[in-house]
């Protein structure tokens, strides 16, 4: 689906992915280090463009590109499988600094909680992916099981984030982002 507005933060903003983003997002998806724990893709830039066109039509599926304040695409974020009161968060690739990547995650979660009005968000991370697992704990997600995704060799930790836990943890993280932004200015 396409969300018609930009979602603006202090260091980044999100906008719905468009077919013209195919080349840059294809390159991101082909970066072996960044997608080590994700489903591997095959195909071409044209295949990525077709995927984006189909994704835009898919009910309850939002895919965003992350932009810095110079309009550079520095990542991707997804909110998908939106149901009555829940959604999933993932499809995350980040090339920004730690503050930009964290704020991009928060903006996606804000979108799910505040715009889509879900009460909980499901997410997962490879057990070996300590950085993502650490971030999930920082935002208040709670593990509920471990298991495997079809076609991926790594064990995964499956977590759920409630609106209540997120609101408590979000304030602390935003204070850090604000302090960074005030100290170093906007990332240009």
What do the predicted segments below correspond to?
Residues 33-52:
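Conserved GNAT-fold acetyl-CoA-binding loop/helix
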Residues 31-34, 57:
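Short helix-loop boundary/capping segments at the starts of domains
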Residues 51-54, 111:
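A generic secondary-structure signal
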Residues 1-24, 28-31, 63, 69-188:
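Acyl-donor (CoA/ACP) binding surface of acyl/acetyltransferases
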Residues 53-65:
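A short helix-loop-beta-strand connector motif used in the catalytic cores of GNAT acetyltransferases and
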């Amino acid at each position: 689906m396409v969300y018609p507005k930009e979602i603006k933060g202090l260091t980044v903003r999100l906008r719905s992915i468009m077919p013209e983003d195919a080349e840059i997002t294809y390159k991101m998806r082909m970066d072996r280090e960044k997608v080590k724990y994700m489903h591997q893709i095959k195909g071409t830039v044209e295949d990525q463009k077709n995927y984006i066109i189909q994704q835009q039509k898919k009910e309850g599926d939002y895919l965003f590109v992350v932009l810095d304040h110079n309009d550079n695409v520095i990542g991707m974020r997804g909110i998908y499988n939106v149901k009555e009161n829940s959604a999933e968060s993932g499809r995350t690739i980040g090339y920004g600094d730690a503050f930009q990547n964290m704020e991009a995650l928060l903006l996606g979660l804000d979108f799910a909680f505040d715009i889509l009005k879900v009460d909980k968000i499901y997410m997962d991370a490879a057990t070996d992916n300590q950085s993502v697992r650490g971030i999930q704990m920082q935002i208040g997600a709670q593990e509920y099981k471990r298991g495997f995704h079809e076609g991926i060799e790594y064990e995964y930790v499956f977590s759920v984030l409630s609106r209540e836990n997120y609101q408590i943890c979000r304030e602390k993280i935003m204070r850090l982002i604000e302090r960074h932004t005030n100290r170093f200015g906007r990332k240009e």
